[in-house]
């Protein structure tokens, strides 16, 4: 890592990084997050009895849609031609709550970690929105990139992707 911010020019102004001279490579990133909630809220969601409908299905779709709109939300992100976005939502009774994992993939000149992070974040936000009427104490957290591949500098992954900070 160079230790230099890439989105700031020599005058301190924000700028979009020029990736035009980079080679296209297969790139992938995976991000995770979690929504902690009361055990009763988790049960309600898993039973499909939430007042707003299918929480898991709706949240998955929201995450996929969000990944495709990342450059509209994050000012200096490049618009990307994603080839795959997948969102997994798994119950964790020990949390208690739902764990989210989002994957973004493309063949291109820049990474897709912001798209994976956006997918994971919006998935968690949608879960919160759909269940807030029954549990106002839900907590969204541990949103982070857990793996990245296709970079010139090599692949990267956290040592324990199941850990929660």
Curated annotation (Swiss-Prot):
Substrate binds at residues 76-78, 114-115. CDD domains: MoaC_PE. Pfam families: MoaC. Its EC number is 4.6.1.17. This is Cyclic pyranopterin monophosphate synthase. It comes from Brucella canis (strain ATCC 23365 / NCTC 10854 / RM-666). Belongs to the MoaC family. Gene3D superfamilies: Molybdopterin cofactor biosynthesis C (MoaC) domain. GO terms for molecular function: cyclic pyranopterin monophosphate synthase activity. Pathway: Cofactor biosynthesis; molybdopterin biosynthesis. InterPro entries: MoaC, MoaC_bact/euk, MoaC_sf, MoCo_biosynth_MoaA/MoaC, Mopterin_CF_biosynth-C_dom. It comes from the Bacteria. The lineage of its organism: Bacteria, Pseudomonadati, Pseudomonadota, Alphaproteobacteria, Hyphomicrobiales. It catalyses: (8S)-3',8-cyclo-7,8-dihydroguanosine 5'-triphosphate = cyclic pyranopterin phosphate + diphosphate.
């Amino acid at each position: 890592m160079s230790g230099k911010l890439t989105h700031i020019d020599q005058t301190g102004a924000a700028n979009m990084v020029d990736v035009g001279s980079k080679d296209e490579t297969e790139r992938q990133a995976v991000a995770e997050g979690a929504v902690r909630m009361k055990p009763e809220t988790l049960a309600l969601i898993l039973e499909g009895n939430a007042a707003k409908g299918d929480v898991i299905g709706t949240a998955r779709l929201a995450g996929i849609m969000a990944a495709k709109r990342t450059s509209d939300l994050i000012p200096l992100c490049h618009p990307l031609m994603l080839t795959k976005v997948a969102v997994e939502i798994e119950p964790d009774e020990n949390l208690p709550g739902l764990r989210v994992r989002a994957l973004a993939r493309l063949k291109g000149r820049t990474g897709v970690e912001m798209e994976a992070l956006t997918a994971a974040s919006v998935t968690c936000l949608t879960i919160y929105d759909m269940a807030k009427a029954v549990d106002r104490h839900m907590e969204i957290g541990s949103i982070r990139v857990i793996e990245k591949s296709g970079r010139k500098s090599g692949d990267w992954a956290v040592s324990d992707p199941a850990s929660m900070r």
